[in-house]
Amino acid sequence: MLIVTVGLLSCFRAPAAPPAPFVPPATSGRAELEAPDGPDGVRLAGRTVWNGTPLTLRYQPLVRAGDRIGDEVFGQLVSRSGRALEVCEGLDYSGLRLSGGQPELISHFECQPGAIYRTALAASADGTLRATATRRVDMSAVDGGNFYCAGAPTRAGTHLASQEYEADARKRLPDGTVADNFEDYNALAAWWDGDLTAAHPWQYGWVVEVADRAPPARRWAMGRFSHELALPMPDDRTVYLSDDSAEGGALYLFQADRPGDYSAGILYAARWTHGEGARYDLSWRSLGHATDAEVAAVVARRPAFEDVFDVATPDGDRCPDGLSLAWTHWGGECLRVKAGLEAAASRVEARRAAALAGATTELEKAEGMALDAGGSTLYLALSRYVRGAVVGLRGPGARDDLQLAPNACGGVWGLVLGEGRAAEGPSGAWVAHTASPLLEGVPADGDRCQEDAIANPDNLAWIEGTRILAIGEDGHRHARNALWFYDVAAGRLSRVLEAPSGAEVTGLRWTPDVAGHSFLSVAFQHPAPRHADGGGGARSSAGVLGPFPR
């Protein structure tokens, strides 16, 4: 039986001094859990010490794609006319929360079209949870949506859902498809009942706010890119936005004009400058102010890309007079924003706008984030460093702000937060100033990663009341993707569970008070067929780890 030790050190704060070069942490546990597969193929560690008290870990499966729960089928996709499509196996975020004082799961599906479900739960006094009814959120107001990835709650009780994998509007064809069918964008025709001419790439790739008593709404002011997660800070005004671009993404910070109202504000993108050792210093480049209304008005006209930008092909590292070279996920381009469209351009093409503003657009697979508010640290998962973040692998004129050694296993970084310093930059106590690697995977032979270290980190969650960062994996470089607990004070890494074979670990969210207990939400996307029930194919699933004592 694997024993996992979890400690409490409430006085710890993130160090302000530059760190030493990264050293792999001590690891607790064997390379693979020896426990047999449990519910839905999950392998769970045995006992843990939780804040000094022995605790037997418990995983509670709650929902599976295709389950009929009450009157609806969990994960059923529909077209805009209500025609039933397939059941989506791309279950991603599935977070436990309270709605009107009652527990529920809010779940995202990474499909085309995407879907969001809300599942009511019953809670027993001993911490047992059970799904009682599910309902699909009507996404008509946001044209269905595309690839709903991670999510986060707001202090106002709403929910921010992130759409990733935005298509390149430069490649839109007259029939509504995009020429390279990026991430199968053209499959969105299913939402439009086969008529993709009614759609535009700029309708997808946004943060969507879900409320109890209002239709879902795009937050156009937050910008369009491959949103992994929009994470609000405690001031309910500052929101960090991670970009799940394959090789040319940015890190964004949005500041709303008014707390809790994300319909207007200033969007910033980070410039990373190499400092001492492994540290990078962060400065913030403004992409300007915008409102939902002014961006939505431009998109409603369904403009061509060239109606908003002047475009030319670079000659090496040179552009025609008046145009500027921008290196992003889409490669090197010469661009200039049309006069009068600056606000809209900065949002419909936020990554390109970030490059034009001098921000760093070299991050690869910037994934989940988690906030340690007491330690003034924001944690960010970078799933790998193999192209954009590695020196010399991009074309002429690329700046190479990031100078990382290639590492296909990726890492988790710690961003130290403090008061905004630049007069023209973001303000308040939640502005990131430095970034340093906290924990990195260790490459092994044959495109693998060492089993006693993390590999391809994705979802993160900070466990309040401890010094523990939960880390979920999404890759193919371990025998099975794992959920880890990392004690940031002791520097100890512990494997807590392994996903079903072939599945990624996703949907992490710490919920501290449900019926007197605390839980860690966790989901498993696209398991291998051998973990299906007797009815047939593999089924994504979600549940909770816990209860943990409060």
Regions found by a protein language model. Name each.
Residues 17-550:
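Conserved small-residue
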Residues 12-13:
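Bacterial signal peptide processing site
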